[in-house]
Amino acid sequence: MKKKINLTQFQTLMLSIWHFMIHLKQRLAEDQINIRAGHLAYVSLLSLVPMVAVTMSMLSAFPVFQGIRGQIEDFIYNNFIPSAGDSVQVYINEFVDNASKGTAVGIAALMVVAIMLISSIDKSLNSIWHTKEKRSMVISFSMYWMVLTLGPVLMGASLVATSYVVSLKVFNGSDLSGVVPLLVERLPMLFSVATFLLIYMVVPNTKVKFFHALLGAIVAALMFEFGKKGFALYLTKFPTYEAIYGALATIPILFLWVYLSWMIVLLGAVITAAMPEYLDKKQSAVEDKNGEKEVVSQVPDVSFSISELPQEQSQEQSQEPSLKPVEESIKESRVK
């Protein structure tokens, strides 16, 4: 009996997943995330150097973060850019060094471009959630500025805290000696999940449930890891861009990877936004079905037995012969 129940539950779960995939396919067709990802990739390439320059300048403002710039760069380039992007790291570092030598007006322009990227991300994600209420200019600018200033600080603080925890003597013992490599190996994955979760919870101007955001964040993080490894494998096994573009191959490679990254981010956002819609639709379908059952149960019973008809006919037939003698007696009396 338990096996049958478990099999039924498994079939119900798979059917629900299939229906959700159909709903997700319709949602992806409506949102057109490929077009949005292209727009965000273009804005990201324009804002990449300003964002990195502002991030490094914010970290350099705090003495505690002065010695970890190299660690942050290595962490970002090794875990969020495919292994074939070593030349990308060199070029970006040169661009950032050149940007940091600019005047105050140039630095302000870089910050404006960086804020434009955050604004584009905000608008794209809110359009996926179909939010009708928009934030005011003051609130939007305050949020963008907070992300631009506090984001690098929080990232640096998390790396410092992780380095401190890993260096504790507790993890250096013989019993826990294998925990440190495992923790360091899983750190980029956990950081990706936390980043996607924060984006899906904070950026939309509507209420998002934690479980829905966590599901979208996990899917996006897994796809990001697989996409990074697959993209690196493609670049190493099939060096098409290097054969065509030569020394300029870094530009299309970087653009393609940024485009794929935004596709993954928007896909996780669509999953998070489509989950409550699917559950509400499923709940309304169940309520409609229950309502139809109640209406059917309230219809009065107008059925009758067919066997009653012959009895009535037999009664009529039995009454007709009883009237014949009376009619004959009346006729005889009239004749007399």
Swiss-Prot record:
InterPro entries: UPF0761_bac (IPR023679), Virul_fac_BrkB (IPR017039). One of its GO terms (cellular component) is plasma membrane. It comes from the Bacteria. Residues 325-336 have a biased composition (Basic and acidic residues). Its main location: membrane. It is found in: Cell inner membrane. Keywords: Cell inner membrane, Cell membrane, Membrane, Transmembrane, Transmembrane helix. The chain crosses the membrane at residues 45-65, 102-122, 137-157, 179-199, 213-233, 251-271. It is a multi-pass membrane protein. Belongs to the UPF0761 family. NCBIfam families: PRK01637.1, yihY_not_rbn. This is UPF0761 membrane protein Swoo_4618. It comes from Shewanella woodyi (strain ATCC 51908 / MS32).
